[in-house]
Amino acid sequence: MRIVVIGGTGHIGTFLVPQLVALGHEVTVLSRGRRKPYQSPGSWTRVDMVEVDRQAEDERGSFGELVAGLGADVVIDLICFTEDSAGQLAEALEGRVQHLMHCGSIWVHGPSASVPTREDAPRRPLGEYGTGKAAIERHLLGRARRGGVPATVIHPGHLTGPGWVPINPAGNLDLAVLQDLVDGRRVTLPNLGMETLQHVHAADVAGVFLEVLAHRSVTVGESFHAVGAGAMTLRGYAESVARWFGRDADLAFLPWDDWSQTVSEEDARITWDHLSHSAHCSMDKAARLLGFRLRYSPLAATAEAVAALIESGRLPGPDLEPS
């Protein structure tokens, strides 16, 4: 099949695109051309790369027709964040593709009510990002269930893998938190460190996309989680990272109002986003309908990311030997 991947050089595309090529598909990747994949096996030489500014094309109302004009059988959209953008694309692809797959987010759920959260749980999104993703899901699946563009939405957890910084045990991207755990220094966590994170390796997210592609008859009009098996508490995550380096984590705790004054405004914002969701979503639907099995646990996914940071020199430390 001819497959167009929008935003295919990022976290998910790095793992997804080479597998699509290996399966014999003709792949075109649309991107701004500003970033190379985190890993570049030889199969990328067989990918047709098209440089395009989606935001500019959306503002002109031309992006959907640009994609439709490529004559794809399947379109995989990894970088859509507004209902208007999704609607333009879906309208242009109506009757012209076999499948449209959209990358959503588990943040469509908002704060957890009962865990593990299933795909059919009521939507109570928080903030602009989660609200936007929930609106896109409602729009695309509504179209699909009315016989319109055949769409599926895949909701990843906290994307993790070699090449970028994982969400750390404080719920943000500050490398100093990981460095302090490596070196045995005290790390202060918000509240009691019992809020949860649900990391997932980008390779596993790519795997869900591949299974959705292979099971079109049961995936059109549906959403699927793409998350690691189980969630980690901030405290448990910190203790595990310390153990990788033969240490017992030296942890302290502060109420949110006090803790947030000890970090930058940006780190506090990111942490609050993660704490307020405390995600713990189920993978049962993908296992039951698609036969999907995860390759990485959340902890193994973050271990690989941290190991890559050490290898690259971005995180000074000994060789990582997770226990």
What are these regions (language model features)?
Residues 147, 161-176, 212-224, 247:
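Glycine/proline-rich active-site loop of Rossmann-fold NAD(P)-dependent oxidoreductases
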Residues 183, 211-271, 304, 316-322:
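Mid/C-terminal beta-alpha module of Rossmann-like enzyme folds, strongest
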Residues 161, 189-195, 222-231, 242-243, ...:
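Glycine-rich Rossmann NAD(P)(H)-binding loop
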Residues 177-200:
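A conserved pocket-lining segment of Rossmann-fold NAD(P)-dependent short-chain dehydrogenase/reductase
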Residues 270-323:
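C-terminal amphipathic/interface module of NAD(P)-dependent oxidoreductases
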Residues 105-128, 142-147, 164:
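Active-site "gating" loop of Rossmann-like NAD(P)-dependent oxidoreductase/epimerase domains
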Residues 138-168:
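Conserved beta-loop-beta element that borders a ligand/cofactor-binding pocket
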Residues 3-25:
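N-terminal Rossmann NAD(P)H-binding glycine-rich loop of SDR-like oxidoreductase domains
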